[in-house]
C-alpha cells in the first residue's frame, strides 16, 4: 500500500476600494487536505500529478471604484485523489462590507464564499469540508480537513480575522481594513503532525505573510494590511508539503492614491 496526501492552493484576497465609505478587500480561503491509501497493483507505472497554484492577488484601484476580486486556488491531485483550493476574496466595495472566500473541501472546491463539500451545516462545515465565509461578514470559520474561510472586509473598521483549520487544511487570510491603522491576524493552518504554518501577524504596515507549511502542515493565511492610507496585504503561506493559505484582503483608500493589492494565495 501507498499513502498519498495532497493539499489544495489558497485563494487570493481582493483589492481594496477607494472613496465614499470604502471597504477593504476580503481575504481568500485556505486549501483543503486529503489523503488516500492506494494498492500498489492499482497504480500505473506513471500517474498524473497536478499541484494547485495559489490565486493571484486582487488588483488595486487608483480612481473611485471597487477593488479587483481575488482568484480561487487551484486543486491538487494524484490519480483519482483530489484536494480542492480555497475560494477567492472579493474586491472592496465603495459602500458595503464584503464576504471572504470559503475554504476548499475534499469533494468540491470553493469559487466564492461558500466552502467546499461535504458540508454538515455546522460552523465547522463538516469534518472534511471547507468552511463557509460568515454571512455576517465576521471572523472566518474554522475548517476540519478543509480550509478555513477568509475574513471579511468592512467599511470604516478593521478587517476581520481569518479562520484556522484544525486537521491539515490551510488557514484563511484576514480582511483588509478601512479607516484604521492596524490589521487583524490571519488564521493558522491545520496539521496532521504537531506543528503548523502560522497565521500572518497583525501589523500597522503591509500585512504579514502566512507561515509556510512544512511536512504535513497547512500553510497559514496572510493578514490584511492596515496602513491609514494605502498598503498591500500579506500573501498566504506557501504549502511546501501542505495546503496553501488564503491571501489577505487589500486596504481601502480614502481618495488620495491607490488602494491596497490583495495578498496572493499560497501554493499547494
Residue ranges and their predicted role:
Residues 43, 103-110, 122, 136, ...:
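Generic hydrophobic, helix-prone segments enriched in Leu/Val/Ile
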Residues 79-93:
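Short peripheral tails and domain-boundary helices/loops at the edges of structured domains
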Amino acid at each position: 500500500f501507498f499513502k498519498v496526501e495532497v493539499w489544495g492552493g489558497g485563494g487570493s484576497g481582493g483589492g481594496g476600494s477607494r472613496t465614499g465609505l470604502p471597504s477593504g478587500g476580503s481575504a481568500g480561503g485556505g486549501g483543503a487536505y486529503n489523503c488516500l491509501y492506494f494498492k500498489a497493483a492499482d497504480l500505473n507505472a506513471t500517474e498524473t500529478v497536478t499541484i494547485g497554484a495559489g490565486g493571484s492577488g486582487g488588483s488595486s484601484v487608483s480612481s473611485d471604484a471597487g477593488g479587483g476580486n481575488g482568484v480561487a486556488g487551484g486543486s491538487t491531485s494524484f490519480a483519482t485523489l483530489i484536494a480542492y483550493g480555497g475560494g477567492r476574496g472579493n474586491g472592496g466595495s465603495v459602500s458595503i462590507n464584503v464576504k471572504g472566500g470559503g475554504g476548499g473541501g475534499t469533494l468540491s472546491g470553493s469559487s466564492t464564499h461558500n466552502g467546499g463539500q461535504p458540508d454538515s451545516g455546522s460552523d465547522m462545515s463538516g469534518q472534511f469540508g471547507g468552511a463557509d465565509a460568515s454571512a455576517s461578514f465576521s471572523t472566518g470559520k474554522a475548517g476540519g480537513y478543509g480550509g478555513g474561510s477568509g475574513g471579511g472586509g468592512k467599511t470604516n473598521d478593521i478587517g476581520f480575522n481569518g479562520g484556522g483549520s484544525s486537521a491539515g487544511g490551510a488557514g484563511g487570510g484576514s480582511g483588509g481594513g478601512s479607516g484604521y491603522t492596524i490589521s487583524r491576524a490571519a488564521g493558522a493552518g491545520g496539521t496532521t503532525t504537531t506543528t503548523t504554518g502560522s497565521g500572518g501577524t497583525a501589523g500597522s504596515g503591509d500585512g504579514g505573510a502566512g507561515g509556510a507549511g512544512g511536512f504535513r502542515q497547512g500553510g497559514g493565511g496572510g493578514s490584511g494590511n492596515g496602513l491609514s492610507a494605502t498598503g498591500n496585504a500579506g500573501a498566504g503561506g506557501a504549502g511546501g508539503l501542505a495546503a496553501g493559505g488564503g491571501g489577505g484582503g487589500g486596504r481601502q483608500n480614502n481618495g488620495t492614491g491607490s488602494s491596497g493589492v490583495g495578498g496572493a494565495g499560497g501554493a499547494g
